[in-house]
């Protein structure tokens, strides 16, 4: 990695380390929640994280940025703007008017679904980089990949701000590159 790339990622890691808010026992007992809201609300920190994510997305040959509902919209939109690309909002079920394409996936206690409009956007044959704030189990990102592939798009990789270690998230993402700004490995 070049010296410029290191300084970009170092600035982003520093911003994440300084501004992330940690909440014990949320959303349930035993979980340490990493809230990136203060990172997003601080201009310098936000720019540092977006710069690093944009650099990563560019290396993955992004033609479109796919942002996952909801913080992935914020990060993905900023990355797409920085790179001069379009952004694909990958929505939770029921947020888009029909017709839609739907991909269901398993949760710990039940199922959920992601959707894209089936009209008005052509992703066939395009390299899409998926962006979100946190990689945990990888279930949502894996479902997003299946959704995009069902529309003949190609997921060229994943870019995340942080990763929760020990949840096996990367195992659910297949063989595509995963770049985490604050990588626990």
From Swiss-Prot:
GO BP terms: adenine salvage; AMP salvage; purine ribonucleoside salvage
Q: Does the keyword Transferase apply?
A: yes
Query: Which GO molecular function, any one, fits this protein according to its record?
Result: adenine phosphoribosyltransferase activity
Report which reactions are catalysed by this protein. Answer: AMP + diphosphate = 5-phospho-alpha-D-ribose 1-diphosphate + adenine
Pathway(s) where this gene product acts: Purine metabolism; AMP biosynthesis via salvage pathway; AMP from adenine: step 1/1
Q: Which Pfam families does this entry report, sorted A to Z? A: Pribosyltran
| Alphabetical UniProt keywords | Cytoplasm, Glycosyltransferase, Purine salvage, Transferase
CDD domains linked: PRTases_typeI
Q: What is its EC number?
A: 2.4.2.7
UniProt-annotated location(s) = Cytoplasm
Give Gene Ontology CC terms.
cytoplasm
The Swiss-Prot or TrEMBL record describes its family as follows:
Belongs to the purine/pyrimidine phosphoribosyltransferase family.
Q: What does this protein do?
A: Catalyzes a salvage reaction resulting in the formation of AMP, that is energically less costly than de novo synthesis.
Q: How does it assemble?
A: Homodimer.
What name has this protein been given in UniProt? Adenine phosphoribosyltransferase
